[in-house]
């Protein structure tokens, strides 16, 4: 469950390290984002020589959340951290690698490129 001001780890190689959510996409009163939702974030920490710089405003998709997500079969999935992947306007990742596992919910929300790049889909 991601809301405005939440700090997320960047799970790709765009150069961003930490992201801060500044908007949850999907309506003016939408407060929370979960796995597979798109957010607008500010880059708070970045590596030198990366694609994105500190202070850049980027679109991201949430790939891991500490808050559990309920699946249709009744099971729950949760991760140790909140993480996101920086994306372009056409829902493709800006980086070329994805680090760490991603949730299966991304497949249902048409983020197939992220799913194929991820080392593990849970």
Curated annotation (Swiss-Prot):
InterPro entries: Ribosomal_uL14 (IPR000218), Ribosomal_uL14_bac-type (IPR005745), Ribosomal_uL14_sf (IPR036853). It holds the Pfam family Ribosomal_L14. One of its GO terms (biological process) is translation. SUPFAM superfamilies: Ribosomal protein L14. Keywords: Ribonucleoprotein, Ribosomal protein, RNA-binding, rRNA-binding. GO terms for cellular component: cytosolic large ribosomal subunit. One of its GO terms (molecular function) is large ribosomal subunit rRNA binding. Gene3D superfamilies: Ribosomal protein L14. Belongs to the universal ribosomal protein uL14 family. Part of the 50S ribosomal subunit. Forms a cluster with proteins L3 and L19. In the 70S ribosome, L14 and L19 interact and together make contacts with the 16S rRNA in bridges B5 and B8. HAMAP family: Ribosomal_uL14. Binds to 23S rRNA. Forms part of two intersubunit bridges in the 70S ribosome. This is Large ribosomal subunit protein uL14. It comes from Desulforamulus reducens (strain ATCC BAA-1160 / DSM 100696 / MI-1). The lineage of its organism: Bacteria, Bacillati, Bacillota, Clostridia, Eubacteriales. The gene is rplN.
């Amino acid at each position: 469950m991601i809301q405005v001001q939440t700090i997320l780890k960047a799970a790709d190689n765009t150069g961003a390290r930490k992201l801060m959510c500044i908007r949850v996409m999907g309506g003016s009163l939408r407060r929370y984002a979960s796995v597979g939702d798109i957010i607008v974030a500010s880059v708070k920490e970045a590596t030198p020589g990366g694609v994105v710089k500190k202070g850049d405003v980027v679109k991201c998709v949430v790939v891991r959340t500490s808050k559990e997500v309920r699946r249709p079969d009744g099971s729950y999935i949760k991760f140790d951290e909140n993480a996101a992947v920086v994306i372009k306007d056409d829902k493709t990742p800006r980086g070329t690698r994805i680090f760490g596992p991603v949730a299966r919910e991304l497949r249902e929300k048409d983020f197939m490129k992220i799913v194929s790049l991820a080392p593990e889909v849970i």
